[in-house]
């Protein structure tokens, strides 16, 4: 099969981090990124392992058309004068094309683990004080369009004794507040889970690398399997509306054979677990470069199909499909690049719920929402309504329902009551639906400036800058 050039872009030299020209090309249904530095030679890496899926995602992304508004000037502190160019002048700079969907604040550099796969290389340093963090929260709350939510990260945020205070402060300014955690402190105390939920926490973003000891021993340096299960159980017992998203770092040969089991575990615990967000390993921070460890989003989607009886790779859409939900309660369109993330929803219902401390009944086999809903038709209608600044209606949803619908119509009317514009209504959706997603953060080897310019996950920094996730972790962190 002949080599086909897909598009040309810019990337980074992994050695000197200078911007260099790059191209994506297809060979035998695999897409590669190839680039050459005048000083350090040629580099090549796998970009996407399924060219057909690449084209499907590209078409579905164009269908939504949600990345049109350029929003960097509205950040309040744009880098309007180019010095070194993208991605070195982040602030956001005037070249950035997508609004902040999720804003991240690193509230500590300390950590109670030394994970071999930590992209942040966390473990030392001092914490910013509470007033510095609150000032960042205030600045982020003034971005326009306003971010959909905020995440406290690090390091390990639960090492801060004032985390509940920070959660409460953020909740007064943002509907959605989440904490990125390894779960060690959650496993120690159900009361701690209750304290953070009472303060206003929306969801714990829980590091969760697989089923059984082995993935944790390899990726985290110790067996944390019982810790993860206890963290989930403590939140189940303590929470009025418990919410956890499982976040597996996926490494080839370590836990890529457990993707199906992780999804099944999430579905079986859907009274607490609201989603799974697989993150193919990013080869930066403490993670050493080894091309044999590389996993791409298509690898995750095909594994989900091969390892479950209910999912197909084509059930997934670009992460921009989340705009259907987020914009309904006033958040910005999710304008990320179609190669950045994939998402699907499983219908799990809520019949397995029995309240705090009660037994959970056996749950029926999950079903992808695409079995019952023509998501592409709904997305086309959404894009038209967005362009006309109109709200999506229940009728718009019903027009997209497939004739084979076996679900109660009350479920659909409840699940897609998007016109309410209330965060709690959309949040309640995740008591009946389980999000299954994949988000692949870049490293210096597969870095693509076209993706960076459409990034929607941004760090808020004490100096006032707002920096795209992959630019921050590859270039700006520690500078």
For the regions a protein language model found, what residue spans apply to each?
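Flexible mid-to-C-terminal extensions adjoining Fe-S/redox cofactors in radical SAM and related proteins
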Residues: 2-67, 379-479
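Conserved alpha-helical substructure of the radical SAM core
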Residues: 29-53, 58-191, 195
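Glycine-rich, histidine-containing beta strand-loop boundary motifs that form or position
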Residues: 107-109, 119-122, 154, 181, ...
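A short, flexible beta-alpha/helix-coil linker loop
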Residues: 121-125, 211-214, 283-284
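Short, solvent-exposed loop/turn segments at secondary-structure boundaries
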Residues: 129, 217-220, 288-291
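Radical SAM/AdoMet-radical enzyme domain recognition
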Residues: 134-151, 160-280
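Radical SAM enzyme [4Fe-4S]-AdoMet core and its adjacent flexible, acidic
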Residues: 238-428
């Amino acid at each position: 099969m002949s080599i086909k050039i897909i598009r040309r872009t810019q990337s980074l030299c992994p050695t000197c981090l200078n911007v260099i020209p790059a191209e994506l090309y297809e060979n035998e249904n695999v897409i590669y990124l190839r680039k050459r530095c005048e000083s350090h030679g040629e580099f090549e890496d796998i970009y996407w392992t399924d060219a057909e899926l690449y084209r499907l995602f590209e078409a579905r992304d164009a269908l939504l058309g949600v990345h049109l508004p350029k929003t960097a000037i509205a950040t309040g502190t744009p880098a309007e004068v180019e010095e070194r160019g993208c991605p070195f002048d982040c602030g956001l700079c005037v070249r950035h094309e997508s609004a902040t969907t999720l804003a991240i604040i690193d509230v500590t550099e300390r950590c109670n683990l030394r994970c071999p796969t930590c992209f942040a290389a966390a473990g030392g340093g001092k914490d910013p004080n509470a007033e510095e963090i609150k000032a960042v929260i205030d600045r982020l709350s003034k971005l326009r369009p306003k971010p959909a939510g905020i995440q406290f990260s690090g390091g390990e945020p639960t090492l801060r004794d004032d985390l509940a205070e920070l959660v409460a402060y953020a909740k007064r300014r943002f509907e959605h507040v989440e904490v990125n955690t390894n779960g060690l402190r959650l496993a120690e105390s159900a009361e701690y889970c209750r304290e953070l939920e009472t303060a206003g926490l929306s969801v714990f973003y829980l590091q969760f690398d697989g089923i059984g000891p082995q993935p944790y021993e390899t990726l985290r340096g110790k067996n944390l399997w019982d810790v993860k299960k206890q963290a989930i159980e403590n939140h189940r017992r303590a929470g009025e509306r418990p919410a956890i998203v499982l976040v597996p770092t996926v490494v080839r040969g370590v836990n890529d054979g457990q993707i199906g089991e992780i999804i099944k575990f999430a579905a079986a615990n859907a009274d607490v677990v609201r989603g799974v967000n697989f993150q193919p390993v990013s080869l930066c921070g403490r993670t050493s470069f080894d091309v044999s460890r590389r996993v791409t989003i298509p690898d995750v989607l095909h594994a989900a199909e091969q390892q479950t009886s209910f999912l197909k790779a084509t059930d997934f859409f670009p992460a921009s499909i989340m705009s259907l939900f987020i914009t309904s309660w006033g958040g910005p369109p999710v304008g990320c690049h179609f190669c950045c993330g994939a998402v699907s929803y499983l219908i799990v219902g809520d019949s397995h719920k029995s309240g705090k401390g009660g037994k959970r009944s056996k749950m029926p086999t999950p079903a992808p929402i695409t079995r019952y809903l023509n998501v592409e038709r709904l997305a086309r209608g959404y894009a038209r309504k967005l362009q006309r600044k109109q709200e999506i209606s229940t009728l718009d949803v019903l027009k997209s329902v497939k004739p084979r619908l076996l679900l109660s119509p009350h479920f659909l009317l409840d699940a897609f009551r998007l016109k309410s514009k209330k965060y709690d209504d959309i949040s309640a959706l995740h008591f009946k639906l389980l999000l299954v997603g994949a988000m692949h953060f870049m490293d210096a080897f597969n870095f693509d400036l076209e993706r960076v310019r459409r990034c929607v996950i941004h760090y808020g920094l004490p100096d006032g800058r707002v920096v795209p996730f992959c630019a921050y972790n590859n270039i700006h962190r520690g500078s």
